[in-house]
């Protein structure tokens, strides 16, 4: 058995954690539908024992997802140490997925569901203080996560689609590159590893016929690409990424989020994200996905 076959034969454990209200339950449901054995709210101290069960070769435990949250704050404090211990001592492949969202979005979700945040201590603390406290306590586990997903602007359907892309096809290369366009006026892409600001390029918004269109339309795309500044920028951008991406892969990173921003996220960033996605698909044998976060907002199209 070669090394690749050995890797494929190993059991896989995905720890799903993150901010309360960011989508952990939805992710666990999605993974369960995809054939994962799922466990909700396992105390971190029991993680090594669970891994021992997985090492016994039970076929039903070959792909496992465990949701762990901050409800048992004292127990949660040991999670980073437990994960590091399992990674160093076990043959089980362990990844950590961290889900987050903006404070404003989390407050909105709690108001919609009328549920209490687990750290509100039966109403003794405000919701915003509970969220901020949780964010601070989770900063360490976030720093070791293989996947960080910001669900602020993701619908439940979009979150499920992203999870399926990452985990559904075992034959795919495990390293994933997500290229996202966004508009600075709608907020920066919070889960981005690399952010590139293209607001210095000529803006199609000021061409009346192009204003209602997006960078997905041929006329807008051609307008953005016809400028010398665009060609110079794209050449420098791809030269930089050609150098950086193999380094990220070598260091064990599972995903890379590249965000390209313009003013509204409708024209320049969309066109360049499309071009960059095509380039990366041609140059690298990795999973490359392109997403346009804000194009529908400015153009008035339905999402």
Curated annotation (Swiss-Prot):
Keyword flag GTP-binding: yes
Chain residues that bind ATP: 18-25
Organism: Staphylococcus aureus (strain NCTC 8325 / PS 47)
Name of this protein: Nucleotide-binding protein SAOUHSC_00787
Domain of life: Bacteria
UniProt keyword terms in alphabetical order: ATP-binding, GTP-binding, Nucleotide-binding
InterPro entries: P-loop_NTPase (IPR027417), RapZ-like (IPR005337), RapZ-like_N (IPR053930), RapZ_C (IPR053931)
Residues of the signal peptide: none
Gene Ontology molecular function: any one: GTP binding
Function: Displays ATPase and GTPase activities.
Family per record: Belongs to the RapZ-like family.
Keyword match GTP-binding: yes
Residues annotated to bind GTP: 69-72
